[in-house]
Amino acid sequence: MLLIREIMYCKPGKVRAMVDKSLAMAKLSEETGMGKMRVMTDFCAERYWTIVSEFEVPSMQAFEEMMKGEGQSPEITKKYEKLMEGYHDLVDYGRREVYKIEG
């Protein structure tokens, strides 16, 4: 099992809009059977205006398939695209971390 952590560093004043997008995405992911996603904001972090989303996947192959939208209906794919519209305007940059869950 792998833990995928998406770390986004938002532009000043844009955190709430990105949190709202992330929470909507988490809800859609859970509704479509892709599992639960946690969305967190910084309390004390490396940088201000940080959002972290994390979720678990069974393998890198499963993650790659999920990122490609494999197994999703065109309707669901369009919902994801609509949710993430304009997110580049909210974020300076981001990174992804992948961890193997040991226990």
Regions found by a protein language model. Give the residues of each.
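Long, low-complexity, Ser/Thr/Gly/Pro-rich intrinsically disordered segments that act as flexible linkers
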Residues: 94-102
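An amphipathic, aromatic/His-enriched active-site/gating alpha helix that lines ligand/cofactor pockets
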Residues: 20-38, 56-95
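Residue-level preference for beta-strand/loop junctions
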Residues: 2, 47-49
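A short beta-turn/loop motif at secondary-structure boundaries
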Residues: 41-47, 87
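Absolute protein N-terminus
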Residues: 1-2, 103
